[in-house]
């Protein structure tokens, strides 16, 4: 033990032996009354403007702690800035304290200390610690959402949907806020709802006949985004327009059917409200406006028109039956739960709502549209809705139907009674309305124009569990019902009024106020079963929830096709998809077909079928910048239907797209450079089942369309933008997802028919090699599918017929005949060519000098004699060529700094032999033809060498327009002999060729 240690030990022993009145060592070793610093201090950055700090109470404090102060200062580059403080009160029995310090600078380092306070004053500061807030890049708010889409529902309501921006920022999006402006009246935006948890809503209580725009902001943990691009200006319907009027709270709060209720829902002056796209809110008991009345059967019957059917009007007001069990993984929940109390006292789970049950008493909780399960927590994809007796789906009110309408419905019932359709002037059947209901397995079509009801009853009853189709038609007072294409039943309403006012939603499968509709519709039961299709006035209604479909809201709805794919066995990479409520197809990848994709085959000429959801995809051959300003497609196709998409591509991050579609028998070419859509439409309709040639092109924002020999159609896209960038594949015959297509593309259905040729900017898209993906593409009925060309020949479709391109050594319609004699003088047919890659030949068609001589004869004014150039050709690529253009003989070359073209005019397409000699020495060139004398020329710039890596072609070449940059569109139609290079290097045209197509002996047939 050293000297110091010995001294301290003796000092401690002395201190312990002091009497009580003496000063203790503990007091002597510290300042009197000072509280120690907090313990176990922990610092952490919360975000870019705040940090958190946590500590424990100091040990052995002489007096009770009354509070703390956090001292913090920003550390600059050279010195610390002014110190700031934050006081923290002490909670009861708090051993650990945690606090957040905010309003700080992003990405900044702070020095932090803490001191405790007691009754005796400030304690000792803790040892300083450092913490740095997160950088600004780590705390970004979201990007603005995409421009919202608005659907006008009535004179006071619109449905709004939007997609989030491309970047959600540094944290997930938590909610949205919605704003509106009336451009004709307002100068600033008004927020109508904040912290919305979804991306589609219905706005109620708007002013009728008024212009509106809407915008959306997204919010995450770091703040709000910028305002989205405002929606297109929309105008709410006028009070007198068909389909006008409010639905929702304005109707559902009136629970009675009193005839003396003078309050008019149309006169409600509601404030703007913002609601989720979900079923109508709860019907409340005891509404002071309502008064239940009783109407006798005789009173009701006296108000009905006599139907043509002998059946008397029937009314079903029995106890609602137990709904059919929901089947499949998407529809698990049973009948909505019944409670003994009213909705005022019932608490429903999230994604559900309450409706009072007047038939049973009490109330029921119903799942919102798209939700299911015991707690309405399961997502249900609805395409073919299934109803359970208490279900319904709502669509916008019938429009343009006040005088006449036609509705077609395909359904399968599981119970004898139930309401299928209802739309009217009020939610409770008062005034004008139309309805379709099942009553004891008979269909009842009822409508009232305001002065008396018509009841039209089907003559035959439906079969439970079987599919049925029913068509309703009304024109003025007259109505018609047709079941399963049977004999129509007609009827007529009473009185003089012939128009129907439709203000409520169109209800399918039931209605929230079905209990009160019994007098009008004849039943208080909801439908039980499935609906496969619904069409109004000739337009098929997409029954999926909005915004994908037209269903605005609903209650307790399942999916009829749920589980249909559970037992499916799609092989070879096929996937199952429901195509009807009770049937499926396998989406087979390219090269497979059959019910389960069991058959492998080679795709030759694609056949597309709308019923099989066919499509194929191919990437753009070159990068997008090659197609920004010019795009041209040539397509040969045979349509089997008047509607469908032929070709489509688009840009995912802008409005750019181009589409070629069939629409009502016409061909339409649509494109958008980002500032407006151009639509070009063929003048005449196309004959179905026949082959047609189509050419469309776009230069900047100008478009051209020509079908067969119809008049050329020209048009222009709107706006000032002139380029189109497409970053997706080219989709042919259909698209994978019709919900993702651009709004103005016109794409609604897959194409039904065949496509045998697609050429993009002179480049052929080959089915076998270039198609990279697709589903359910089969072979068309065409001779080329049977591979008729023998000995390696390739089949070239020519509408209904074909041509064979035969390899060297074979000839005949199907290349079936071998050429046994040597070909001294080859004959070319316009799609022929000979190829040479011998270095001794190629070096004589490159470098600083070139000399070529040949004899030829032809009957065509255009055709290529000789070509050598880079492949692929680029701007200012080196090349050398000799050929006929519009009757003139042209010698051209480019040494890298510009093209030289030396031309000799003459009658060279006379079918006689002609001699031509083309000589180049550096930049200078000369061509001599027969006795016409020499023509000379010189290439521009400084380049003197011909630098080429490609092969030499004689008489033509593959993809001639593409490879020559459209200098030549076809090969020679004629013969060539005596081909000599460098004055003395004689080439045996056929024997020296490494490849060739369609070569025969000159003069042979």
Swiss-Prot record:
UniProt keyword list: Cell projection, Disulfide bond, EGF-like domain, Extracellular matrix, Glycoprotein, Heparan sulfate, Proteoglycan, Repeat, Secreted, Signal, Synapse
Biased composition (Polar residues): 305-314
Gene3D superfamilies documented for this protein: 2.60.120.200, Immunoglobulins (2.60.40.10), Laminin (2.10.25.10)
Limits of the Fibronectin type-III domain: 37-136, 144-239
GO cellular component assignments: basement membrane; cell projection; cell surface; extracellular matrix; interstitial matrix; photoreceptor ribbon synapse; presynaptic active zone; synaptic cleft
PROSITE patterns: EGF_1, EGF_2, EGF_3, FN3, LAM_G_DOMAIN
PTM comment text: O-glycosylated; contains chondroitin sulfate and heparan sulfate.
Pfam families tied to this protein: EGF, EGF_Pikachurin, fn3, Laminin_G_1, Laminin_G_2
Compartment(s) where it occurs, according to its Swiss-Prot or TrEMBL record: Secreted, Extracellular space, Extracellular matrix; Synaptic cleft; Presynaptic active zone
EGF-like domain location: 339-377, 561-598, 780-816
Quaternary state and interactors: Interacts with DAG1 alpha-dystroglycan. Interacts with GPR158 and GPR179; transsynaptic interaction is required for synaptic organization of photoreceptor cells.
Identification of the protein by name: Pikachurin
Biological source species: Rattus norvegicus
């Amino acid at each position: 033990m050293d000297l110091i240690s010995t001294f301290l030990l003796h000092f401690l022993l002395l201190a312990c032996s002091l009497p009580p009145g003496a000063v203790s060592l503990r007091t002597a070793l510290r300042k009197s009354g000072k509280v120690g610093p907090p313990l176990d201090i922990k610092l952490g950055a919360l975000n870019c403007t705040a940090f958190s700090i946590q500590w424990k109470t100091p040990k052995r404090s002489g007096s009770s702690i009354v509070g703390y102060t956090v001292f913090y200062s920003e550390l600059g580059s050279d010195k610390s800035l002014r110190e700031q403080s934050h006081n923290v009160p002490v909670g009861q029995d708090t051993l650990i304290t945690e606090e957040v310090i905010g309003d700080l600078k992003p990405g900044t380092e702070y020095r932090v200390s803490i001191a405790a306070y007691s009754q005796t004053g400030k304690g000792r500061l803790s040892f300083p610690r450092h913490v740095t807030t997160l950088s600004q890049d780590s705390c970004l708010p979201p990007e603005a959402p995409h421009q919202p889409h608005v659907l006008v529902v009535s004179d006071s309501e619109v449905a709004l949907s939007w997609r989030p921006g491309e970047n959600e920022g540094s944290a997930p999006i938590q909610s949205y806020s919605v704003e509106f402006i009336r451009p004709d009246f307002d100068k600033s935006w008004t927020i109508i709802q904040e912290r919305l948890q979804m991306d589609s809503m219905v706005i109620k209580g708007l002013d009728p006949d008024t212009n509106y725009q809407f915008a959306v902001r997204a919010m995450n943990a770091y703040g709000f985004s910028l305002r989205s691009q405002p929606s297109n200006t929309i105008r709410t319907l006028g009070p007198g327009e068909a389909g006008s009027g409010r639905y929702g709270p304005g109707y559902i709060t009136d629970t009675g059917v009193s005839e003396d209720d003078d309050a008019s829902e149309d006169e409600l002056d509601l404030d703007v409200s913002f609601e989720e796209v979900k079923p109508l809110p709860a019907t409340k008991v005891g509404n002071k406006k309502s008064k239940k009345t009783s109407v006798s059967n005789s009173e009701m019957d006296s108000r009905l028109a006599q139907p043509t059917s002998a059946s008397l009007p029937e009314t079903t007001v029995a106890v609602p039956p137990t709904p059919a069990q929901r089947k499949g993984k998407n529809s698990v929940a049973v009948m909505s739960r019944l409670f003994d109390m009213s909705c005022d006292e019932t608490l429903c789970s999230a994604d559900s709502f309450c409706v009072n049950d007047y038939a049973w008493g009490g109330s029921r909780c119903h799942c919102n549209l798209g939700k299911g399960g015991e707690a309405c927590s399961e997502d249900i994809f609805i395409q073919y809705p299934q109803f359970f007796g208490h279900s319904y789906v709502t669509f916008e009110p019938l429009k343009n139907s006040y005088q006449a309408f036609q509705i077609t419905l395909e359904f399968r019932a599981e119970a004898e009674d139930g309401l299928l359709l209802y739309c009217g002037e009020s939610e409770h059947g008062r005034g004008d309305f139309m309805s379709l209901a099942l009553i004891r397995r008979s269909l009842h079509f009822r409508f009232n124009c305001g002065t008396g009801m018509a009841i039209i009853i089907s003559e035959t009853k439906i079969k439970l569990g079987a599919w049925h189709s029913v068509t309703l038609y009304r024109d003025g007072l007259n109505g018609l019902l047709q079941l399963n294409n049977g004999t129509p039943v007609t009827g007529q309403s009473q009185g003089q009024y012939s128009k129907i006012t439709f203000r409520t939603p169109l209800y399918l499968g039931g209605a929230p106020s079905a209990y009160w509709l019994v007098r009008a519709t004849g039943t208080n039961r909801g439908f039980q079963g499935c609906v496969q299709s619904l069409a109004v006035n000739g337009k098929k209604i997409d029954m999926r929830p909005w915004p994908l479909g037209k269903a605005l809201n609903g209650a307790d709805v399942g999916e009829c096709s749920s589980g249909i794919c559970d037992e499916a066995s799609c092989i070879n990479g096929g996937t199952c998809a429901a195509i009807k409520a009770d049937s499926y197809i396998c989406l087979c990848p390219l090269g497979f077909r059959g019910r389960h994709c069991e058959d492998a085959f080679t795709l030759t000429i694609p056949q597309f079928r709308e019923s099989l959801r066919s499509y194929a995809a191919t990437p753009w051959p070159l990068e997008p910048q090659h197609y920004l300003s010019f795009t041209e497609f040539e397509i040969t196709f045979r349509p089997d239907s008047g509607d469908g998409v032929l070709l489509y591509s688009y840009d995912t991050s802008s409005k750019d797209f181009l589409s070629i579609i069939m629409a009502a028998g016409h061909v339409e070419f649509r494109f958008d450079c980002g500032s407006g859509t151009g639509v070009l439409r063929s003048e005449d309709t196309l004959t179905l089942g026949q082959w047609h040639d189509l050419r469309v092109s776009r230069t900047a924002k100008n478009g051209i369309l020509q079908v067969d020999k119809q008049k050329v159609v020209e048009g222009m896209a709107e706006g000032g933008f002139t380029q189109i960038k497409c970053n997706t594949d080219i989709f042919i015959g259909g698209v994978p997802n019709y919900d993702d297509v651009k709004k103005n593309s016109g794409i609604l259905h897959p194409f039904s028919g065949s496509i045998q040729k697609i050429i993009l900017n002179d480049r052929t898209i080959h089915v076998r090699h270039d198609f990279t993906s697709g589903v359910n593409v089969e072979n068309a009925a065409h001779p080329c599918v049977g591979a008729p060309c023998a000995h390696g020949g390739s089949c070239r479709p020519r509408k209904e017929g074909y041509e064979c391109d035969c390899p060297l050594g074979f000839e005949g319609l199907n290349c079936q005949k071998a050429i046994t004699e040597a070909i001294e003088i080859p004959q070319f047919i316009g799609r022929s060519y000979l190829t040479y890659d011998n270095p001794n030949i190629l070096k004589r068609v490159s470098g600083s000098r070139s000399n070529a001589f040949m004899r030829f004869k032809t009957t065509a004014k255009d055709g290529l004699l000789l070509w050598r150039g880079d492949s692929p050709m680029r701007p200012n690529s080196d090349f050398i060529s000799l050929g006929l253009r519009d009757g003139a003989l042209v010698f051209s070359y480019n040494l890298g700094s510009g093209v030289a073209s030396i031309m000799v005019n003459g009658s060279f397409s006379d079918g006689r032999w002609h001699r031509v000699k083309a000589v180049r020495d550096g930049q200078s060139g000369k061509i001599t033809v027969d006795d016409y004398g020499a023509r000379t020329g010189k290439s521009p710039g400084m380049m003197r060498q011909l630098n080429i890596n490609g092969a030499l072609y004689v008489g033509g070449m593959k993809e001639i327009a593409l490879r020559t940059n459209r200098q030549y569109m076809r090969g020679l139609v004629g013969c060539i002999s005596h081909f000599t290079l460098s004055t003395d290097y004689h080439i045996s045209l056929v024997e020296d060729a490494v490849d060739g197509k369609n070569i025969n002996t000159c003069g042979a047939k």
